[in-house]
Amino acid sequence: MATKQTRSRANLPKHPLLEMLDVRSAEVEIFAYSVKIVCGKQAETNCCCVAGARPGVYATEVNIQNLNLVPALVVKLVLPLINSGAVVAREPNVADPFALPGRAIEEAVRLPPLGATMDDCCRIAELLLGAPPSGDTGLTIAILTIVSLVELSVSAVYTANPLSGDGISIDVEYIPSRRLGLRGRD
């Protein structure tokens, strides 16, 4: 007896991200979140081209919660634009997560129903450098891409203070989900 065929795994585009999420059909929805990361210290400089940010100390903390009653498989990719003070993706250069050495792509994390996790500057540095940093680190600006088969709640907490230590700025942003397309228009 014939059954209606749906797009199978054989018809999926080949991509390591789809394998990590264990995507089995082109009909599945994939939710993606793009979070700006600003971490470390931007020192005063006499150079004409200060990369990324004004002098100061910056930190980012990203909260991820699974507001579903089923477990959520979550994959995270870190795309460094400035890595510990070195500009690595100023045009014409680009950050390609699948060409980066080390652990820029984290293995899938399973969040239990209503469970949560976080990524902070220490975790981002560990993913980019292969180990947690010791001491002050230079400015790192990156994009943390979070991908899941279920919609998540994602927020980012940004703090900054001037090098003088006078005052502090804190900002919280809620990151909207976007649908990740598996292929172009049919």
Q: What is the predicted function of each stretch?
A:
Residues 2-186:
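Gly/Pro-rich, tryptophan- and cysteine-flecked surface segments typical
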